[in-house]
């Protein structure tokens, strides 16, 4: 896989583009749980597929490249991006995951975004893994999804480049002292530890969408 340092881009792939929309790239039709159980019994869906499912559940929206990098963070060798993409394709065909891409006035996006599908939630529940996903989550607008993708990249960058990296939280929550209102930072949070001392960083991602200044203040 090409390293991040080798990619020369003037504009972030997660920046907003004029006229950008989200386009469905998943599977239509019906898949039964019996079909999925058969695939598991036949060895077509294995432990690494379940790990991928857990990663998507944790991050909500994520690219295949980010999944690759997080698998490496967990000490799992995906072998190659093509092999990982084949596994993702299998999960999409089984309606365990679904997939989208962005299109804009500049053309079709170069990456796919993966998120949970109904069968994925069933499988997570069967393993007693917490899954707060609702089908309506997949209707979130482009701006919200790109914030999540940018937040994913912050977490990955800290893990790969900062020796003091300790842990991360995808959706850290802050509670206002006076109002008691809970805010969830869109960029995630990381904990750095060195010489027995720890410090937490929480990130808020801003995308230049319509009314972005007002949304940021709110």
Give the predicted meaning of each segment.
Residues 1-128, 138:
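Nuclease-adjacent, charged terminal/linker segments that flank catalytic cores
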Residues 63-64, 130-137, 197-203:
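Glycine-rich, often proline-containing surface loops adjacent to acidic residues and nearby aromatics
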Residues 124-169:
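Amphipathic alpha-helical dimerization/coiled-coil segments
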Residues 143, 155-199, 204-212:
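Active-site metal-binding core of divalent-cation-utilizing nuclease and nuclease-like domains
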Residues 212-218:
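Basic, amphipathic alpha-helical patches used to engage nucleic acids or provide basic targeting signals
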């Amino acid at each position: 896989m090409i390293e991040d340092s080798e990619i020369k881009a003037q504009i972030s792939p997660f920046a907003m583009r004029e006229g950008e929309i989200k386009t469905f790239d998943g599977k239509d039709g019906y898949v039964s749980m019996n079909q999925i159980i058969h695939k598991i019994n036949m060895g077509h869906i294995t432990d690494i597929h379940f790990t991928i499912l857990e990663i998507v559940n944790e991050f909500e929206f994520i690219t295949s490249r980010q999944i690759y990098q997080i698998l490496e963070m967990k000490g799992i060798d995906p072998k190659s991006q093509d092999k990982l993409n084949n596994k993702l394709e299998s999960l999409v065909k089984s309606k365990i995951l679904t997939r989208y891409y962005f299109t804009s006035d500049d053309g079709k996006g170069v990456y796919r975004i993966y998120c949970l599908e109904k069968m994925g939630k069933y499988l997570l529940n069967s393993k007693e893994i917490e899954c707060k996903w609702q089908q309506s989550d997949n209707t979130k607008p482009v701006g919200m999804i790109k914030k999540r993708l940018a937040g994913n990249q912050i977490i990955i960058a800290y893990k790969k480049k900062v020796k003091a990296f300790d842990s991360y939280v995808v959706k850290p929550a802050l509670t206002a002292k006076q109002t008691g209102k809970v805010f969830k930072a869109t960029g995630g949070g990381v904990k750095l530890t060195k010489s027995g001392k720890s410090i937490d960083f929480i990130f808020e991602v801003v995308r230049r969408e319509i009314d972005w200044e007002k949304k940021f203040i709110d």
